[in-house]
């Protein structure tokens, strides 16, 4: 047996050991004769977001009680808006309510509608299960994924137990996406993004939400995780232009100290949005980002630069990345409503100055194809022919277009390598020709709402209070899978790959190898019930208010 065969056998055994630990659940790595620990109640230590605190929570303050009452009153408005989605999806009221905050019970259904997960599931029946099984057998990054899963949202009650239900679902999603989109594969940020989706969506819905988030041109997140990196460069250039215009002293100091090339605020921003601030503010910013799209990225970085202007001018070259990250986090150490209020004002200001989006990309040499695009959301005219399509065959996912594209309608679908689907589109009402209404201008930001015509349509037979909205309440977040995924998915795998068999058993697990994980000591001693603590008491109901409310 040569070295290659030995290495391949070792990697296969390592994959099987990791998968086996997640299949065993909470008891992974514990002695067989060790009995279960007494069940611990977290009722007095868990806040309304699901974060477990070390000590018992104090009574609600008047401000917190007011926020709870406000969220309950907004719940009925969001339910009505979801029930009449065709009316509200292109309205300003949707954006106004997104900045005010989505109720926790509505966030899952709303994210699902915004990212069109139901349509993706209908178009790809059984695809997620097949990708998951392939990932289990051939993942090249399963050790990194396992290490990152062990440190993702560990203070949340869903992810507190090592090898628990939600950690197993998170592992499955990341393995499936690595197989689904080889261009991106896996990177650490995906673990946190998928974990946020799992807080409010079932496993398969969270997978398709992740797929849509990275593949959607409106959100343009794939550029942050793709080797091409087009998104990062385009937004970085626009950020330098905006900062140089609004804070020339800050940008001059950054250039003088040669800090711009060493620390990317936009790269830091993505990490801040998923792992650097309080969970409540993180969710509120993600609500705005999913509704607004990539236009929200520039205002967020602009606020951070503005608030930290004095500190940034004193930043030396010694450790600029660490200094900037720490001060960037300090920007958000304040009231959530205040942050969202400043974000809305920054969005309006940048839209008025046409600085919310990067300028159109310059045409590349040797390319003659061009298409008309508007200059910005608030622009009056179209810059016809000011950018050209990149030459050469398309990648697995089309690279983001650095201009505010007009509304688009699907024309045909083209399968791409890696399981992706690329839609050939044209501007709505134009058939490839610029619309006269867009070319002649209109009210400021008028076409900005037209882009919602391309948003997913809500099913006409939808019952808002019905079973379509799984995870509508935290009660349904405690579901326990009774049948293993291996047993359920074996027919799907054998149907597509008759020459292969679904593995029915794995090798014996090895000892835990999570070195350096802060939760390792606790994980080795954990053996809570498989279902985990019930979150039935976490949903917002008026009956849970303190006396007097």
Swiss-Prot record:
Keyword terms of this UniProt record: Cell membrane, GTPase activation, Lipoprotein, Membrane, Palmitate, Proto-oncogene, Ubl conjugation
Region described as Disordered: spans on this chain: 350-419
Locations listed in the record: Cell membrane
Alphabetized InterPro entries for the sequence: Rab-GAP-TBC_dom (IPR000195), Rab-GAP_TBC_sf (IPR035969), Rab_GAP_TBC_domain (IPR050302)
Modified how: Ubiquitinated by a CUL7-based E3 ligase, which leads to proteasomal degradation. Palmitoylation is required for membrane localization and protects TBC1D3 from ubiquitination.
Role: Acts as a GTPase activating protein for RAB5. Does not act on RAB4 or RAB11.
Note: TBC1D3 is encoded by a collection of very similar paralogs with multiple copies of each paralog, some human genomes encoding well over 50 copies depending on ethnic origin of the donor.
Protein's UniProt name: TBC1 domain family member 3
Lineage: Eukaryota, Metazoa, Chordata, Craniata, Vertebrata
């Amino acid at each position: 047996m040569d070295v290659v065969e030995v290495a391949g056998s070792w990697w296969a055994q390592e994959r099987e050991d990791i998968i086996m630990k997640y299949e065993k659940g909470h008891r992974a790595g514990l002695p067989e004769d060790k009995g279960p620990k007494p069940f611990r109640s977290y009722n007095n230590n868990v806040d309304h977001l699901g974060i477990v605190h070390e000590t018992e929570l104090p009574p609600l303050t008047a401000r917190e009680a007011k926020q709870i009452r406000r969220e309950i009153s907004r719940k009925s408005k969001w339910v009505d808006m979801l029930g009449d989605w065709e009316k509200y999806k292109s309205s300003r009221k949707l954006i106004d309510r997104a900045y005010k905050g989505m109720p926790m019970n509505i966030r899952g259904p709303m994210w699902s509608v915004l990212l069109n997960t139901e349509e993706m599931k209908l178009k790809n029946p059984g695809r997620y299960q097949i990708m998951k099984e392939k990932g289990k057998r051939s993942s090249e990054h399963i050790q990194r994924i396992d290490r990152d899963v062990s440190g993702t949202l560990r203070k949340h009650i869903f992810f507190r137990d090592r090898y628990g239900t939600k950690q197993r679902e998170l592992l499955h999603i990341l393995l499936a996406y690595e197989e689904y989109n080889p261009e991106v594969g896996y990177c650490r940020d995906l673990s946190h993004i998928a974990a946020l989706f799992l807080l409010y969506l079932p496993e398969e819905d969270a997978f398709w939400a992740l797929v849509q988030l990275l593949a959607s041109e409106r959100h343009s997140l794939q550029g942050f995780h793709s080797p091409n990196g087009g998104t990062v460069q385009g937004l970085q250039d626009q950020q330098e232009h905006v900062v140089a215009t609004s804070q020339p002293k800050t940008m001059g100091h950054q250039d003088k100290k040669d800090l711009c090339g060493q620390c990317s605020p936009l790269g830091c921003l993505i990490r801040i949005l998923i792992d650097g601030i309080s969970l409540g503010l993180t969710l509120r910013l993600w609500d705005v980002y999913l509704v607004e799209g990539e236009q929200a990225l520039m205002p967020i970085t602009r606020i951070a630069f503005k608030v930290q202007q004095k500190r940034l001018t004193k930043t030396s070259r010694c450790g600029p990345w660490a200094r900037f990250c720490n001060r960037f986090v300090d920007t958000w150490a304040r009231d959530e409503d205040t942050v969202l209020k400043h974000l809305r004002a920054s969005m309006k200001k940048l839209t008025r100055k046409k600085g919310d989006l990067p300028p159109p990309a310059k045409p590349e040499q040797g390319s003659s194809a061009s298409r008309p695009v508007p200059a910005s959301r608030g622009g009056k005219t179209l810059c016809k022919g000011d950018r050209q399509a990149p030459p050469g065959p398309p990648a697995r996912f089309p690279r983001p277009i650095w201009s505010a594209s007009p509304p688009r309608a699907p024309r045909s679908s083209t399968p791409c390598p890696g399981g992706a689907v690329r839609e050939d589109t044209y501007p709505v009402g134009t058939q490839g020709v610029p619309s006269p209404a867009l070319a002649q201008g209109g009210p400021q930001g008028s076409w900005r709402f037209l882009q919602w015509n391309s948003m997913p349509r809500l099913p006409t037979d939808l019952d808002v209070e019905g079973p379509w909205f799984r995870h509508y309440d935290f009660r349904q977040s405690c579901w326990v899978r009774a049948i293993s995924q291996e047993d359920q998915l074996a027919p799907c795998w054998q149907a597509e790959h008759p020459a292969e068999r679904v593995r029915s058993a794995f090798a014996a697990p090895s000892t835990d190898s999570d070195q350096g994980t802060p939760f390792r000591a606790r994980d080795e001693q954990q053996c809570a019930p498989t279902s985990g603590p019930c979150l039935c008491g976490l949903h917002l109901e008026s009956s849970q208010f303190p006396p007097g409310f």
